[in-house]
């Protein structure tokens, strides 16, 4: 499991997750969810978002659910932690939640459209589900370079935001917006290492050969100082149980 292997490296490399964890907390402050009812972070990893929420809502305890045991062990000892495969419906004892969050997790799941309906069903009326995930418009530099040199694109194909929420009423969709986030690296070798370090290389394509990597490095668009960029597009969606 990529995520078990990446658990110890995750916190130092997860700048993009940290950035959007802070953004999600800003939204939670504006929404001011009910304090009664459980607050749970789904796919919590080492607890980045859950800790950030607790830092800003000192009276709230956030439960953490993840499918990587190593990731859960990186969390605070005193918090409720559940080891669970999020490809399955949530445990039946979870219900009446006033806040469910999920930062950078849903795109790993086998059937996100189905799973998000299950998560939504666990909310109490007035409760919020907040998710963030990379969209299918991520990594244009990588895709263009592969097209240019006729090499198979081996990155993940992320989600289409309209697809994900197609079963929800427009009144339930409280907020949906895309944000661009740019990472900058010395070269494509460091760029690919970074993708690997957050456990994000789970793709069925063959590993690139040294020759192919050299080609990619040569043709990837360069900045004036010869560095390379990786552009992410991240969607944040807030769904409200009426």
Regions found by a protein language model. Give the residues of each.
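Conserved Class I S-adenosyl-L-methionine
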Residues: 46-48, 175-242
């Amino acid at each position: 499991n990529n995520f078990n292997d990446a658990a110890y490296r995750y916190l130092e490399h997860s700048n993009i997750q940290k950035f959007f964890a802070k953004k999600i907390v800003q939204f939670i402050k504006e929404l001011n969810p009910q304090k009664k009812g459980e607050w749970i972070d789904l796919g919590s990893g080492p607890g980045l978002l859950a800790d950030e929420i607790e830092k800003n809502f000192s009276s709230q305890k956030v439960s953490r659910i993840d499918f990587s045991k190593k990731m859960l062990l990186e969390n605070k000892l005193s918090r409720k932690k559940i080891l669970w495969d999020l490809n399955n419906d949530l445990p039946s004892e979870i219900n009446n939640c006033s806040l469910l969050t999920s930062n950078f997790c849903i795109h790993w799941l086998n059937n996100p459209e189905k799973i998000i309906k299950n998560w939504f069903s666990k909310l109490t009326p007035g409760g919020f589900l907040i998710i963030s995930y990379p969209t299918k418009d991520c990594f244009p530099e990588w895709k263009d370079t592969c097209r240019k040199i006729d090499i198979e694109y081996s990155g993940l194909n992320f989600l289409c935001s309209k697809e994900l929420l197609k079963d929800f009423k427009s009144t339930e969709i409280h907020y949906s917006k895309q944000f661009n986030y740019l990472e900058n690296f010395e070269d494509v070798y460091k760029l690919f290492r970074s993708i690997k370090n957050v456990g994000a290389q789970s793709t069925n394509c063959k590993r690139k050969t040294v020759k192919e990597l050299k080609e990619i490095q040569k043709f990837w668009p360069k900045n004036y100082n010869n560095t390379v960029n990786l552009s992410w597009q991240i969607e944040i969606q807030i769904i409200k149980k009426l």
